[in-house]
Amino acid sequence: MISDFPLLTFITLFPISAGLLIPFLDKKGNQLVRWYTLIICLIDFVITSYIFIYKYDLNIDTLQLIDDYAWVGPIEFHWKLGVDGLSMPLILLTSFITTLATLSAWPITRNSRLFYFLMLAMYSGQLGVFLSQDILLFFLMWELELIPIYLLLSLWGGKRRLYAATKFILYTAVGSIFILMAGLTMAFYNSNVPLLDFQSLANKQYPLALEIVLYLGFLIAFAVKLPAFPLHTWLPDTHGEAHYSTCMLLAGILIKMGGYGLIRINMELLPNAHVIFSPWIALIGGIQIIYGALTSLGQRNLKRRIAYSSISHMGFVMIGISSFTDLGLSGAMMQMVSHGLIGAGLFFLAGTSYDRIRTLFLDQMGGISTTMPKIFAMFTTCALASLALPGMSGFVAELMVFLGFLKSNAYSFDFIALITFLEAVGIILTPIYLLSMLRQMFYGYRKLKLTNTLLLDASPREIFIMSCLFLPIIGIGIYPNLTIPLWNTKVEAIEQLNVFKSVGFK
C-alpha cells in the first residue's frame, strides 16, 4: 500500500531538518532550545501515533504506507520506506523514548545547542533504520545514527569518555563494513542491475555456501549492536561514561536495532542459513543470560551493573528469534519493547541519583531511601519490572520466549531442556543482582557525608518521565494484547515460510 502523502519520509527527515534551525534560535540561555527540541519530538511522536491509529492496518502482513522515490538511477538506489509489523512497534518506541530522553536532558547547559541537534539527528537515523526497505539506505541510516552517539559520548561523557567513544565507534564501524559488503554482494549476485530493495532480495536464491557467508556477515554486525556475547564489551564502557539521557537512547532504542536486523535481514532474506545458525544463536543467547547476570552481580558501578543486565535480557531476544514458533518470535518482539521501556527507566533513575549523590559506586551508597522516598519507590518499581515481576511487561516477554522455545518442534528434547535450564538459571539470578543493587543504594547506614538539602527528592519533571514509562510497562503487563497485535500478523507470516515449517534438529 503506497501512501498519498509521504508520511514516513516526513517523520524520518523532520527531526534532523528541524535540528538544522537550532543555530538560528536566540542564543540567550537554554530555555528556548530545550522547548524547541521537545516540541519537535512531540510533533513527530504525535504524527507517528496518527500513522498507527488511522493509517496502519494490523491485519496486513505486507508493507504499508510505502514511500518509493528513485535516488541514484544508475544503480537503482531508491529512497524506499515502508512499515509493517516488525517496524511499527519499534518506531513507536523510538518516538516515545526519544521524547522522554529529550526532557530528561534539560539539566545539560554546556553546548546545549549541539547536544540537542545531535539528539534530533540520532532520532532521524534510528527511525530510518526501522523504516528503510532498501539495503543501501538501511546501511546509510545505520551509519547516520553512529556519528551523533559518538559525539554525545565523547563531549558529554565521564572521565573515560574518549576511550569509551573510541571503543564504541571501532566496534560498530567494523560491523557496518560487514553490512555494506554483504548487502552489496546480495544486490549484485546473479543480476546485471543491482537489486537493493528488501522485497526483491527476499525472492533471490543463493548457493547455500554463499548464503552462509552472507548470513555470518550480517550476524557479526547485528551481534555487535544487540550486543551478543562475546561482542558486547563496548556496551558497559559506553553506558558507564555516557550522560543518562544518552543511555536512555542506547538502552531504549539502539540495541534493539540488532534484534530488528536479525529478524528483518537474517531471518527473512536468508532463511536457509538461519536454519543452520539458529541452534548456535539460541545457545549463545542462553549463555549470555547467565553471563550477563553473573557479571552484573560483580559490578561496583551502578550504570555498568544495569548495562550487564541489559546484555542478559537481550539473550531472551536471541532465543526467541531461534525458536521457530510464533510465540517465541512474538516474545522476542515483546522483550525488545519491554526492555526498551524498563532499560530507559533504570538508566534515567541512575542518572538522577548521580546528580544528587555524585557517585556511581554502589559500595559508597546506602541509606538514602528516607531522604529520597519518591526516587526509592520509582527505582524499586523499575527494578521489579526488570526482574520480570508478574503484572509487568518483563514477565510477559520472558514467559512468551520461555514457552515459545519449550513448545518448539525444531529441536531435540535434550537441546530444548538445555536452553530452558539456562533461561531458568538466568531468571533466578536476575532478582539477586537487582535486589542487591537496591539494598546497597537505599538501605543501611548512609556512607556519604551529604546533607539532606543536597539529597532532594524527585522533581515533578522526573516523576512525569517515570510515570510515562510506568504506564506502558504496567499496561502491557496487565493486558499484553495492547502490543501483541502490532506484530502478530507479521510474525505468523515469517514463521509460515516453507523453509521454517520443515525445520527439525532431531
Swiss-Prot record:
Q: What is its EC number?
A: 7.1.1.-
Keywords in UniProt for this one? Chloroplast, Membrane, NAD, NADP, Plastid, Plastoquinone, Quinone, Thylakoid, Translocase, Transmembrane, Transmembrane helix
Parts of the chain that traverse the membrane: 5-25, 35-55, 88-108, 114-134, 135-155, 168-188, 209-229, 243-263, 275-295, 309-329, 331-351, 386-406, 415-435, 463-483
Name the predominant localization: plastid
Q: What class of enzyme is it?
A: translocase
According to the lineage, what is the superkingdom?
Eukaryota
> Where is this chain's protein located in or outside the cell?
Plastid, Chloroplast thylakoid membrane
Q: Name one GO molecular function term.
A: NADH dehydrogenase (ubiquinone) activity
The keyword Hydrolase is assigned to this record: no
What catalytic activity is recorded? a plastoquinone + NADH + (n+1) H(+)(in) = a plastoquinol + NAD(+) + n H(+)(out); a plastoquinone + NADPH + (n+1) H(+)(in) = a plastoquinol + NADP(+) + n H(+)(out)
Membrane topology is: Multi-pass membrane protein
Q: Which family does it belong to?
A: Belongs to the complex I subunit 4 family.
Query: PANTHER family under this entry?
Result: NAD(P)H-QUINONE OXIDOREDUCTASE CHAIN 4, CHLOROPLASTIC, NADH-UBIQUINONE OXIDOREDUCTASE CHAIN 4
Please identify the protein, giving its name as recorded: NAD(P)H-quinone oxidoreductase chain 4, chloroplastic
Organism of origin is Chaetosphaeridium globosum
